């Protein structure tokens, strides 16, 4: 039985729906910040609860290496370890493992059974297989999990990308089998089982994206993710291939645009029919003093939504004497009460409070953006 309900498709192409998870219902489309290692830098769980943050993404690879699974299991799972009550999605860690190995072959080797790699933390060697990745994600106790996949750079030859596609399909099948075994072993009810996502690889090749999607759909998953970087080797956004891939995924399945992205890219992809997004952009940009701000008195409209916001660099000298609030419309008291001049001062002194406030501003902006997308017609 599907846990995703597609309620309506708007004239702009936005898919309005809902997902039932063990920890509540989530409206789609939605954005998840990356709490990669079990936290968002400089932002506490209480900060996140204040802005009503929903699901977040954690990373299997990073948590497996530190604090290691024994510690998380002892804590009672990732939710208890993090003191987080809302849904969590675990990324399989495939992107991180393969980035490590592709950048430096001395750090590991890909084989048909999985990947052997050296920990960049302590130099210890580890083997991750599709089965082990699923077992770890069940131990994390997440609400949504992602199959282990082979994630090559987009500038690889078509032949090498095809090898990764075929390996990804094979591993997805093994992940699905192990997923079934874990459900049975742990006696998990249908209403409480974590959702499982297959990952569509294929680089910039349309035919390989199509091949991968069709084979994954035959295996059958709750949702399907767009794998690898959403830009080509020159940094151009892969809008055409993202739209093409979204249309290959069954209407009744969730569509997860992994690693996307900027506010304007999220709007584009929501129009293409993607339901879920995650990225480090709001918090990473915030830590570097770049803030997303809604233009006041501007009505948000999907076709020209890029004009709905501006990005400012609070470190610029023009903000040194700007005593207007950081964001007068924010629900966060500090953002309404502190001035841009004060935030500029904090960044000049490298005071962590500045990065925290900027990160909170951007997270709130993203949540409001998704709400406006859901309410647009």
Question: Locations of the language-model features?
Answer:
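Non-catalytic, usually N-terminal nucleic-acid engagement modules in DNA/RNA processing proteins
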Residues: 1-189, 317-320, 348
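Charged/polar low-complexity intrinsically disordered segments
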Residues: 13, 184, 299-303, 307
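Alpha-helical scaffolding segments of alpha/beta enzyme cores, especially the outer helices
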Residues: 132-135, 163-170, 174-177, 207, ...
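Glycine- and acidic
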Residues: 153-158, 162, 223-230, 352-355
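Glycine-rich phosphate/ribose-binding loops and adjacent secondary-structure elements
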Residues: 182, 195-297, 307-326
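Gly/Ser/Thr/Ala-enriched C-terminal appendages of enzymes
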Residues: 280-296, 307-374
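Histidine-centered catalytic/metal-binding microenvironments
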Residues: 377
